Amino acid sequence: MQFLALALTILLAAATQAVPMQADAPSQLEHVKVAMMEYMAQVKETAQRSIDHLDDTEYKEYKVQLSQSLDNLQQYAQTASESLAPYSEAIGVQLTEATAAVRAEVMKDVEELRSQLEPKRAELKEVLDKHIDEYRKRLEPLIKDIVEQRRTELEAFRVKIEPVVEEMRAKVSANVEETKAKLMPIVETVRAKLTERLEELRTLASPYAEEYKEQMVKAVGEVREKVVPLTTDFKGQLGPAAEQAKEKLMALYETISQAMKA
């Protein structure tokens, strides 16, 4: 009886599949075999976990016997599966051949149904569009009411918060002025201190600057005293070139002198 039920199940499954399913019957049987082996492994694992919780002292011999029984059961299932493998493949091939005509009829009926439904697609689209338009007309007033309600709520919120914003803006301006008033004395104090320190620095550096200026003027004068005789000597020898060199040196001297007097 169980074999007959399995055969009918496979027959019905094959009858509802397309042509490419002709080679799937053996694989379906293979899936059943794999599923049974996985189920046996899970049963063994669950039972083994339960056995492991038993006390080794009192149930040691029982645990060994039960573990051995589970191993034997799994091995028996594996052996039976391997022994039935050729028969499973043969049954799959026979079922595929036996149901070929049925599958062909099913595919023919499906194709006829598709041909009949194809012209109905436009009608179906029209009906769906009609229903969607009805839903839209029904929902549109509700959506407008919700939007208007939210707009009213936002306007009321704006009216409530606007005075608060203005008050905060006024407070910020007042706080800025207050902070500025508090900071200005500090800024003026720092500015006065810096001015005082700069004046002290200028006063301290003034003697050194005057001394440096005097030394530079003296050095330039010495250079001039040495250069003038040389230019006079070279004047007769070099002619116009010496005169130009003298003019350039005198101009340089005047520039340095003016800079020192500044």
UniProtKB/Swiss-Prot annotation:
SUPFAM superfamilies (alphabetical): Apolipoprotein A-I
Cystine pairs: none
Keywords: Cholesterol metabolism, HDL, Lipid metabolism, Lipid transport, Repeat, Secreted, Signal, Steroid metabolism, Sterol metabolism, Transport
Pfam family, any one: Apolipoprotein
Sequence repeat spans: 64-85, 87-107, 108-118, 119-140, 141-162, 163-184, 185-206, 207-228, 229-239, 240-262
GO biological process: acylglycerol homeostasis; cholesterol efflux; cholesterol metabolic process; lipoprotein metabolic process; phospholipid efflux
Domain of life: Eukaryota
Region (10 X approximate tandem repeats) residue spans: 64-262
GO MF entry, a single one: cholesterol transfer activity
Range of residues in the leader sequence: 1-18
Assigned GO CC terms: chylomicron; extracellular vesicle; high-density lipoprotein particle; low-density lipoprotein particle; very-low-density lipoprotein particle
Family matches, as PANTHER family: APOLIPOPROTEIN, APOLIPOPROTEIN A-I
Function: Participates in the reverse transport of cholesterol from tissues to the liver for excretion by promoting cholesterol efflux from tissues and by acting as a cofactor for the lecithin cholesterol acyltransferase (LCAT).
Family: Belongs to the apolipoprotein A1/A4/E family.
Protein name: Apolipoprotein A-I-2
Species, as recorded: Oncorhynchus mykiss
